[in-house]
Amino acid sequence: MDASTLTSRLQTATASFRSLERQLADPDVANDPKRLETIARERSRLEPLVLDFEALQKLEQEQADARELLRESRSDAAMQELAQDELSELEAQHTALLQRLTLALLPRDPRDDRSVMLEIRAGAGGDEACIWAGDLARMYERYGQKLGWSVQQLSCTEADLGGYRELIVSVKGTSVFSQLKFEAGVHRVQRVPATESQGRVHTSTATVAVMPEADAVEVELDPKDLEISTARSGGAGGQNVNKVETAVDLLHKPTGIRVFCTQQRSQLQNRERALEILRAKLLERELAAAAERESSHRRSQVGSGDRSEKIRTYNYKDNRTTDHRLGRNFSLEPVLQGQLEDLIGACIAEEQRQKLEALSEETDD
């Protein structure tokens, strides 16, 4: 991004920021909680950008002053050295700030701020794949807890020997999608299963889908398209069996998507959860179709959200996690304990690199 384009975009962002500040002082906005929240969130997003732009302008003035001092002190060797040292320091700060601002101005996914629903499905590998799906669920739960996110199980189908055939988890917090979107795809594990008596290494898989939460306005549901039935929630028998039909079985007839919710205490709560999951699934289908229409270059990017992409292998024998998109290895045990910061950070850096490359190609054209 050239200097004039960067300055123009920063000036536009500053103008938007000032406009948002004026709107926040408007009594009509103060009386509209949803609008107030939207404006306040956008203002908070732009504020660091505006402050960095102001710092950049100040640095550029200081650089100009240092160059002037350098010219005026040609006859004073000691002063020349001081002025040159100051100029070098200012130029280093200027370069770092320019890089940060350039990254901040890259095209932004409007879904990055959202909470998500994680759908984890056992893939190839039978019982071991179900156990592996449970291990992945615990990995994400630990990561979410470290970041102060709320992680709640919405729906699950448990397997006979442990783990899950399918699990849907709600993850609520700040900018959850911006990080977990890199987890969508096929996760492969290579290890000796607990069910293996001969000590042989097996390869199993689980698929992760990352669905940004969708509201009722974004995904409209026609009641005629829904088939809803109820059932008693399952249990271990005796007093643990729910005598009231609280479970909800929801079918979206046009797509064939079925959602079964039993986790909540009341039928109404399970119905609301089922509708939330359905909206998220429908939004994911819509986004996947849009991605399919885009170029193959776009789909090859990290974080494209393709649930069929083989993204990672977890090798227990070598204590190694390999991210195939990055071509990098990470220590296995910390990753399984939810220490995903380095891995996800590397994915974010790669996404930024790809966006910068695309921006450079657009500028060249």
From Swiss-Prot:
Species of the source: Synechococcus sp. (strain CC9902)
Source species, domain of life: Bacteria
Alphabetically ordered keywords of this record: Cytoplasm, Methylation, Protein biosynthesis
Family to which this protein belongs: Belongs to the prokaryotic/mitochondrial release factor family.
Name of this protein: Peptide chain release factor 1
Cellular localization per UniProt: Cytoplasm
Lineage, top ranks: Bacteria, Bacillati, Cyanobacteriota, Cyanophyceae, Synechococcales
PANTHER family, per the entry: LD18447P (PTHR43804), PEPTIDE CHAIN RELEASE FACTOR APG3, CHLOROPLASTIC (PTHR43804:SF8)
Listed GO CC annotations: cytoplasm
